[in-house]
Swiss-Prot record:
MF terms in GO: 1-acylglycerol-3-phosphate O-acyltransferase activity; glycerol-3-phosphate O-acyltransferase activity
Bias (Polar residues): 9-18
Any one of the GO BP annotations: glycerol-3-phosphate metabolic process
Organism name: Homo sapiens
Subcellular location: Mitochondrion outer membrane
Domain notes: The HXXXXD motif is essential for acyltransferase activity and may constitute the binding site for the phosphate moiety of the glycerol-3-phosphate.
Associated pathway: Phospholipid metabolism; CDP-diacylglycerol biosynthesis; CDP-diacylglycerol from sn-glycerol 3-phosphate: step 1/3
Function noted in UniProt: Transfers an acyl-group from acyl-ACP to the sn-1 position of glycerol-3-phosphate producing a lysophosphatidic acid (LPA), an essential step for the triacylglycerol (TAG) and glycerophospholipids. In vitro also transfers an acyl-group from acyl-ACP to the LPA producing a phosphatidic acid (PA). Prefers arachidonoyl-CoA as the acyl donor. Required for primary processing step during piRNA biosynthesis. Molecular mechanisms by which it promotes piRNA biosynthesis are unclear and do not involve its acyltransferase activity.
One Pfam match: GPAT_C
Modified-residue entries (Phosphothreonine), positions: T660
Name of the protein described by the UniProt record: Glycerol-3-phosphate acyltransferase 2, mitochondrial
A GO-annotated cellular component: mitochondrial outer membrane
Length: 795
């Protein structure tokens, strides 16, 4: 795999002395400086608008057109102007003076307010089932409440917060080149906070540094001390004690006990009282909606859903009239110290371990000019009360993946059921089980909705673009980088960089230095070669950040590939594939099949969006990007002829959430629509590029289907996942498909096959065990499953 960094493509040997390669990194590329024209002087999209379907009032009232014109600020850049003083001494002590000037509101009488809260008092007086009643000694109960409260939080220490902010500011300036924040997004959040409603930030989770960087950012912007809901499993006791004094919150282990446990009832009542007190006092709260980095599990965090449940319950009972939810995301060029060891990813971070990691980061960056960049994204706030009242879902009847896909995989039927997929990988913990069933569903849909908004508002960094080009485009990095940047902006996503093209490429390649090799083949020409093995796996993980931008087109391209799989040879020319007519019904069916196969954690469909609405969106995207062209069949009314259309009676009474084809009022007319693949010169390469974006996941699924013949079953879920991961690694060594050798892809394949009915789970004394279902015990059905998956893969 070779990629040219210059305009001409050459084929030369890849070998080069290591000393000569090292000189390439140190001496620069020696190429002509060129300005980035695609996004300088063009409209930069303002991303992060809230859902107009679920929260229309917030969409209009909590947004101001003027804020889109504001620029960016570097939140870790503190100068003399950021303090009240001036002079040469201030310029040397500006970090320290800035930390002293930060306003930290005091927290007084918190334990007494918690004890006097309605929930705790009702529990102590025996007014709720499981209450202690009059039989217990009040002093012992108060001590138990204080013990639970001490596990949850501690009053923030102003001196410690200021000292930590000063040290963190110095550390961030050594680690990061800049931490960019859109001034318009910050202004939007500040204006929303002026209404007096509490802010609840719901964030993605790239690294443990997110929980430190976001509070520092909000403190520097004058929004006070951010209370962070941490995961107890990710921190040691000593680190938890430090984080509590800095404003951290931890869920007590008793809160996950059974519903009839008195200890669990008391712990949940205390946590609920703590959340209510935070919301009443107006302190901002940060909740992570994703699992901690390195955790092998579902993307949506069960702990994050539990914290969201407490906030929803506080608003529903009227403790606070409303709360403003702010989707947040933090993106990095490279995630600092991302855990990559499957055996040690779940180990808690200790205080001394964290200190050594900080020192190691500082030592590695000492004298290094290539520091990483970061971007903080604050999406448009929206009203939680409005979402509770007006949130709607297109889910009517739901079916499991086994009911939807298994008959089609086995060839027993061809029609796709007109229903949504039910797939919930995130376990429901004790705090969420304590809510009503409809409230549990509300919390799950809200969490999925906000996580989708956070991912959609994330900017694409230069390293993600570079990794994608190195994996899936093999021509000219300079030209393709500009093209891909423009395609991202045209789709309403933002990029986390700007500057000159040569500098951007040099910056990203320097950060990816451990995974690529630079070879000079002639004067002015440079060859970029990805390192085989783990380097390709790392590049595939980086390129996955680009998938949300092109996800609709990628799903559509793979669906078209599946539709053409049985008609033309896989290696057939593009002109031969463009001759075939593709009906709209066939396209809908293939898109639905692929949608059901792909995990919900990847698609992140909003609950207010139906599958058929998404199918229409995918088809529209394929037409807009020029891959599909409408074909007028003889005797049919042209698609552009809207003058003779008449309103159908059934359209007049459709639900407002039912978004169907706007060009046709009768489904019978839509059935007759046909499309062809476009014959434009750029279409074959772009079609292949879109298909390859989903190829790591689909190839992992196909290899998991082939592994059914070799897997040792029955086994535990973790044991079988480890078996599959070792098989993916062995296959990668043989075939060179290293982008599939990812433990997250392995566990995603195992869970998908479990939902599909390929694997069945049975209880045992040692825990649940997986075994092969009788239906897929035959080699014939296993081959049908593998062929069903491989039809969507473009070789």
């Amino acid at each position: 795999m070779a990629t040219m960094l210059e305009g001409r493509c050459q084929t030369q040997p890849r070998s080069s002395p290591s000393g000569r390669e090292a000189s390439l990194w140190s001496s620069g590329f020696g190429m002509k400086l060129e300005a980035v024209t695609p996004f300088l002087g063009k409209y930069r999209p303002f991303v992060g608008r809230c859902c107009q379907t679920c929260t229309p009032k917030s969409w209009e009232s909590l947004f101001h057109r003027s804020i889109t014109d504001l620029g960016f600020c570097n939140v870790i850049l503190v100068k003399e102007e950021n303090t009240r003083f001036r002079g040469w001494l201030v310029r040397r002590l500006c970090y320290f003076l800035w930390s002293l000037e930060q306003h930290i509101p005091p927290c007084q009488d918190v334990p007494q307010k918690i004890m006097e809260s309605t929930g705790v008092q009702n529990l102590l007086s025996g007014r709720v089932p499981g209450g202690t009643g009059e039989g217990q000694v009040p002093d012992l109960v108060k001590k138990e409440v204080q013990r639970i409260l001490g596990h949850i939080q501690a009053p923030p220490r102003p001196f410690l917060v200021r000292l930590f902010s000063w040290a963190l500011l110095r550390f961030l300036n050594c680690l990061f080149l800049n931490v960019q924040l859109h001034k318009g997004q910050m202004k939007m959040v500040q204006k929303a906070a002026q209404a007096g409603l509490p802010l609840v930030l719901l964030s993605t989770h790239k690294t443990l540094l997110d929980g430190i960087l976001l509070p520092f950012m909000l403190l520097s912007q004058g929004l006070g001390v951010l209370r962070v809901a941490w995961d107890s499993r990710a921190c040691s006791p000593a680190l938890r004690a430090l984080l509590r004094k800095l404003g951290g919150l931890f869920l007590p282990p008793e809160a996950s006990l059974s519903l009839d446990s008195s200890e669990g009832l008391l712990a949940r009542a205390v946590v609920q009282a703590v959340i209510e007190q935070l919301l009443v006092s107006g302190q901002p709260l940060l909740i992570f909606l994703e699992e901690p980095p390195g955790a092998l599990g579902p993307r949506l965090s069960a702990l994050g859903q539990a914290w969201v449940g407490f906030v929803v319950q506080a608003v529903q009972v009227g403790i606070v009239p409303d709360a403003l939810l702010v989707p947040v995301a933090v993106t990095y060029d490279l995630v600092p110290d991302a855990p990559c060891d499957i055996d040690h990813a779940s180990a808690p971070l200790g205080l001394w371990t964290g200190a050594l990691a900080v020192l190691r980061s500082l030592w590695s960056r000492w004298g290094c000019s290539h520091r990483i960049c970061s971007r903080v994204h604050l999406a448009q706030p929206f009203s939680l009360q409005e979402y509770i009242v007006s949130a709607r879902s297109c889910w009517g009847g739901r079916q499991t993946l086994e009911q939807l896909l298994q008959p089609i995989v086995l060839g027993q039927c061809t029609a796709v059921p007109d229903t949504e997929k039910e797939q919930e990988w995130t376990p429901i913990t004790g705090p969420l089980l304590a809510l009503k069933e409809e409230d549990q569903l509300l919390v799950r849909r809200l969490s999925c909705h906000v996580l989708s908004a956070s991912v959609g508002s994330s900017a694409v960094m230069s390293t993600a673009i570079m990794a994608t080009l190195l994996l899936f485009k093999h021509q000219k990095l300079l030209g393709e980088f500009s093209w891909l940047t423009e395609e991202i902006l045209l789709r309403g996503f933002d990029v986390g960089f700007s500057g000159q093209l040569r500098s951007l490429l040099q910056h990203s390649l320097s950060l990816l230095r451990a995974h690529v090799a630079l070879l000079r083949i002639r004067q002015g020409d440079l060859l970029v070669v990805p390192q085989p093995g783990p380097g390709l796996t790392h590049l595939a993980q980086l390129s996955a950040e680009l998938l949300p931008v092109f996800l609709s087109e990628a799903v559509g391209a793979c669906a078209v590939r599946g539709l053409l799989a049985g008609r033309v040879p896989p290696q057939g020319p593009w002109e031969l594939q463009g001759i075939l007519l593709l009906s709209q019904n066939e396209l809908y069916r293939q898109i639905l099949l692929l949608m059901h196969l792909l995990p919900q954690d990847l698609l992140l469909l909003k609950p207010c969006q139906s599958s058929y609405c998404y199918c229409q969106e995918v088809l529209d995207r394929l037409i807009q990007c020029g891959l599909l062209v409408a074909e007028e069949t003889p005797g049919s009314r042209p698609a552009c002829d809207t003058g003779r259309q008449r309103l159908s009676r059934k359209l007049l009474w459709k639900p407002s959430g039912d978004f169907t084809d706007s060009d046709s009022d009768d489904f019978g007319e839509a059935d007759g629509r046909y499309f062809r693949l476009s014959q434009q010169s750029h279409c074959p390469d772009f079609f292949l590029f879109l298909c390859r974006l989903l190829s790591p996941l689909l190839k992992a699924f196909a290899q998991a289907a082939a592994f059914l013949r070799q897997g040792q079953l029955p086994d535990t879920e973790l044991g079988y996942t480890e078996q599959l991961f070792q098989f993916l690694q062995a296959t990668a060594q043989e075939e060179g498909i290293f982008e599939c050798a990812d433990p997250k892809l392995a566990i995603s394949a195992v869970w998908t096959f479990r939902d599909l009915g390929v694997l069945q789970q049975t209880p045992s004394p040692a825990g649940p065990r997986l075994h092969l279902s009788p239906t897929f015990a035959s080699l014939d059905n296993q081959e049908k499953l593998e062929q069903f998956i491989r039809q969507f893969i473009c070789s």
